[in-house]
Amino acid sequence: MFGRRKAMPQATVDVATSPPLAPIAPVDLTSHEQVSAVLGVAAGIGQVLIAAGTTNFDAKNQVVAVTEAYGLFHCHVDLTYTRIRLFSYVADSRRNPVTVVRVMPAPVQDFLRLRRVDTLIRDILSGRASLVDAQARLNAIITAPPSLGLVGVVCSWMVLGGAVTLLLGGDVWAAAASTVASGLVIWLAAVLGRRGLPLFFQNVAGGFCAAVFASAVYHAGLVVGLLLRPSMVIATSIIALLAGLTLVQAIHNGVSFAPVTGNARFFDTMLITGGVVAGVAIGIEVSVLLHVPLPPMETIAAPNLASATIRVLGGAVASAAFARACYADWLSVGVSGLTALVGSSVFYFML
């Protein structure tokens, strides 16, 4: 009863912004190699955070916290959408400057890598990771292969596509068609990406395939007496292509003194979205030329208790599938699905 109370966990960014009591793992600040190593670890951590979608403000706080944890308090951090630069100097009589530059890789939503970096940051701030240990662990995190192969990623996106169709009010047949369409566009994007095709054209190709596939499935369903909603097939394919894009990051960067990165993220989002719209438009026109046009948009009835329950379950499965597609471990997948289940239940049953 009177035992020691367990400290509640804090978010990493809150830990990072807390003032350090003292250098936890100090290094020789008069050594150019030691200072460069500290800046290299901090820059690598910032590189992973930015690539995972962390805003510049939060990433800068964590980079500064890492350098201060090793006793390097005089460090300037310059972050943009494509580059991170750290400036400091050797604490000797000559004060020779030290600069470390890292070029940002293409944004990749790898939740497992982000979680490992989060653990590394906590270990550095708590003194459990020396500089040598941090270098080795960071290198292992950056060079580690994806925890999920292409087949697993495609299957996760297929599950997401089918679940989103149920979330939108579709039936089982529409969900099955959306599952196949999502897998097709994600597989096509992965193949084109490996060949070096820019993301804009990947999304054009994905949108084109989604529209043509939806038209083909709709007319094939008419032959066997099934009335499918091709609009749902196209919508779920678009969600699969654009699931990683958000305006929240752009706006957050814009209001947190990072206008360059905010504008870059905003333009990037608009350009890639335009690629999907162009691909879908081309696919619709090609379907008309092939005499298999798409029907007008259908209206969906208001949800009742049964359909609302299916939508809630669809939202939970879609959230869990997205987390798995982003390489999250199974515990995180379960938490993601449970969170979506609670949120969807509140929305459909209480509001």
Residues covered by each model-derived region:
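Soluble N-terminal domains of membrane-associated systems
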Residues: 1-133
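Alpha-helical transmembrane segments and their membrane-interface boundaries
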Residues: 108-115, 119-351
